[in-house]
Amino acid sequence: MTKKRGDGELVQVGELPMMKQLAKKLAPPTKAQQEFINAAVVIRTDPDAVERAFMARQLVLCTLPHSDPGDANPRWLRRTGNSSLIIQPGWDGQEDKSFGYPFGSIPRLLLFWITTEVQRTKNRENMTDLEKRTLQLGRSLNDFMRAVGLNPYTGGGKRGDGKRLHGQMDRLFNSRITFQQTAEDVNIKGRHSLNMEVAPESELWWDVRQPAQGSLWNSWIRLGEDFYKALVLLPVPVDMRALRALKRSPLALDLYAWICYRSFVIVQKQQPPQFTAWEVLMRQLGTDYTDPDNFKKKASKALAKVKTIYPGLSIGKAKGGFTVHATRLAVPQKTVTTISS
């Protein structure tokens, strides 16, 4: 069937903008979209069957870069309110160059895994402090990829999860992280700084080209003492099932952890819906963005995904921002410890 153009030419009905838009809406979901839908169904069908994971509160309130900052600057800074996160990259002695900054979804998934392992072993009386700070990564890269929520079957090429994971591990484990907080009163001004090596000692024996093949030796990392202490205190509980569903978007991962933190306080204190301004959220989680309208657009899409995989969460529209309300925790109360607001 055809329709006349204004100049008398004919055009296929399927080429009309309205029909293209309708066809797009009716198109079958992509593989990634179907995986997200399946994950959401599982979580909503049994919301209490959580796979407990944690993130350090400081890394929820100030987050890593979304994209690669490059090597032009000797440090990367994110500031929100009176809190700051500063990252300095490590140096590769073999290549005589910077490892670069950790960025994107993968170092976030690594930090979720690290914080969760720290919480799992922190109270074991049969382990020394050094043993608690030493995390075993295993002999197989494939097994570790599954543990952090990645797909071991994406191949060993440049864009495969294995290659990207190995590169981001180098970036994260060799970096130095600083948390800073300032306090100011009428007569006094103070600042607290905590400078930390992430993993001052590590051994990685995996072959990215053969990720399924086990090595003769275990791979492991030893967390810096101060970094370990920071991870132990006041972690934010999250559901690993949701992390796997959101892993393609660093912004969605950041927003999910932030929503879990906000919702914990809302549910515990039975608060009404809490307002957040887009401008404030952009300063906190979106410093990679330069256009506020673009950030709002991307954050709105990410929040819609978070709402889909968080039963009991409500996101409302408000002038200049949005409201957050929750009727339940992302992780059931009986499985979490109290976090400070």
PLM features per residue range, with description:
Residues 1-341:
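Charged, alpha-helix-forming regions
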